[in-house]
């Protein structure tokens, strides 16, 4: 039957995770910011996403152009507990390993807490898959607006960049998503 100990444990963990997310207050102010007047940005991502280094490179360049400070929090859930070496040179990005989370996948290291304590005008969710640790991290941040791409988290976003809706249309690359959102955030006026 499906009730082996591992399935049972995963079921219990999943129930606790849902409960934890429900208990977290929403710190998102739903206040639109253009890149012109944003002062601080948060980036939450999965370190192992295939094009993440390119996407962060684009974002890094654009944010610097606008004089916006940013912090990034990457979750790296690999079996071998390694970070994405292509991101190691960014001073404002922390990558968290599985062993640096508790049994619920909540990051427990001080750098994560420092990230959560920040106040951000815009938060970019660059992850493309559902993930408790990512969702938890987004909910812990005080931010004006959330920009994202993950269809499963669409209700959390103030700006959801979509693509690849039709069966024939391929989903845009992560780099394309980032370019589209930067373009949009450059055009909009802050409210």
Predicted regions and their residues:
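Short, charged/polar "capping" segments at the starts of alpha-helices
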Residues: 50-52, 79-85, 155-156
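Conserved nucleotide-cofactor-binding alpha/beta core module
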Residues: 64-116
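Active-site-proximal region of nucleotide-activated glycan assembly enzymes
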Residues: 8, 155-191
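Active-site and donor-binding regions of nucleotide-sugar-utilizing enzymes
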Residues: 98-166
């Amino acid at each position: 039957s499906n009730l082996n100990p591992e399935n049972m444990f995963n079921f219990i963990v999943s129930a606790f995770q849902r409960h934890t997310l429900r208990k977290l207050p929403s710190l998102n102010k739903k206040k639109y910011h253009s890149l012109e007047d944003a002062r601080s940005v948060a980036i939450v991502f999965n370190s192992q996403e295939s094009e993440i280094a390119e996407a962060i490179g684009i974002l890094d360049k654009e944010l610097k152009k606008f004089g916006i400070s940013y912090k990034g929090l990457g979750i790296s859930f690999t079996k071998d507990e390694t970070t994405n070496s292509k991101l190691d040179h960014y001073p404002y990005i922390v990558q968290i390993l599985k062993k640096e989370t508790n049994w619920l996948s909540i990051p427990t290291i001080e750098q994560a807490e420092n990230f959560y304590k920040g106040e951000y005008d815009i938060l970019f969710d660059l992850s493309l898959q559902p993930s408790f640790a990512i969702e938890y991290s987004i909910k812990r941040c005080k931010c004006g607006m959330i920009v994202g791409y993950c269809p499963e988290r669409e209700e959390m976003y103030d700006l959801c960049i979509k693509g690849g809706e039709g069966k024939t249309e391929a989903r845009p690359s992560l780099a394309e998503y980032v370019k589209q959102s930067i373009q949009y955030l450059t055009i909009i006026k802050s409210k």
